[in-house]
Regions:
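Substrate-contacting helices/loops that form the catalytic groove of nucleic-acid
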Residues: 1-126, 208-232
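Positively charged, low-complexity nucleic-acid-binding target-recognition regions
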Residues: 1, 131-232
């Protein structure tokens, strides 16, 4: 248990809550730290509308690139400020380490701005928020680690059983023997990620009607030291 003395701070990323951070032992969500992403999402929507209008007007490439670059830089400043707030929150704990999902999506702003079926979160916002959080943590001297992302938004942080999401924002544990009933889904996910940092923490998920034995998804927490890439 080489990292048992570290305080893992799980950070869940989303559009409504850009960052939700919590250590595994936080007694309730009032001690977690959340940064709302709604304004950034609205600005990304505006930027897409702006590019659509420029393309419709037949604006030249230089004009479009200059417009996008200026607004993108403003968005990155906002995301960096949010990431800094998360790092300050984490640094208040003893021997903190930030724990995020092991995802490798690369941000692609042009996909969001021009592809008809693009999704702003997966195309740009979430990969960017992930990379910037790790970059800012690096600047702050805060250690980072990633853990497997599978089921992290569905698993109960307390008992490990897969629950459900009755309204998207709420997580509900379906295990009748668990003390968790319902709670904020993002807060639950942050705690699941923090929990996975420690050795031996495996997902307890069993398919409800499965007859196979001994092959649950093994989600052994792992640490990685990854150098960071700046978003384009
Ligand atoms: Zn539970």
């Amino acid at each position: 248990m080489h990292n048992a003395d570290r305080t893992a701070i799980g950070v869940d990323l989303g559009e409504y809550n850009l960052y939700t951070a919590s250590p595994v032992k936080m007694p309730d969500s009032s001690g977690a730290h959340t940064i709302c992403g709604e304004e950034i999402c609205a600005r990304l929507d505006e930027l897409r509308d702006r590019v659509t209008a420029l393309l419709y007007e037949g604006a030249d490439r230089e004009t479009i690139v200059a417009s996008v670059t200026r607004r993108r830089d403003g968005l990155l400043e906002e995301i960096d400020a949010a990431a800094r707030e998360i790092c300050e929150y984490a640094n208040a704990y003893d021997r903190p380490v930030l724990v995020t999902e092991d995802s490798h999506y690369q941000p692609d702003l042009w996909t969001w701005l021009t592809a008809p079926n693009a999704h702003r979160g997966t195309a740009w916002l979430l990969p960017t928020a992930h990379l910037r959080l790790r970059a800012v943590a690096d600047e702050c001297g805060l250690e980072v680690a990633t853990v497997p992302e599978a089921y992290s938004s569905q698993e109960c942080h307390a008992c490990g059983v897969i629950g459900d999401r009755p309204d998207g924002e709420t997580f509900r544990c379906t295990n009748p023997h668990c003390h968790v009933e319902t709670l904020c889904a993002d807060y639950n996910a942050a705690k699941v990620l923090a929990r996975r940092y420690y050795p031996g923490r495996r997902c307890a998920y069993r398919p409800p009607h499965s007859v196979s034995r001994g092959e649950p998804p093994t989600l052994v927490a792992e640490r990685r030291s990854q150098r960071l890439q700046r978003p384009p």
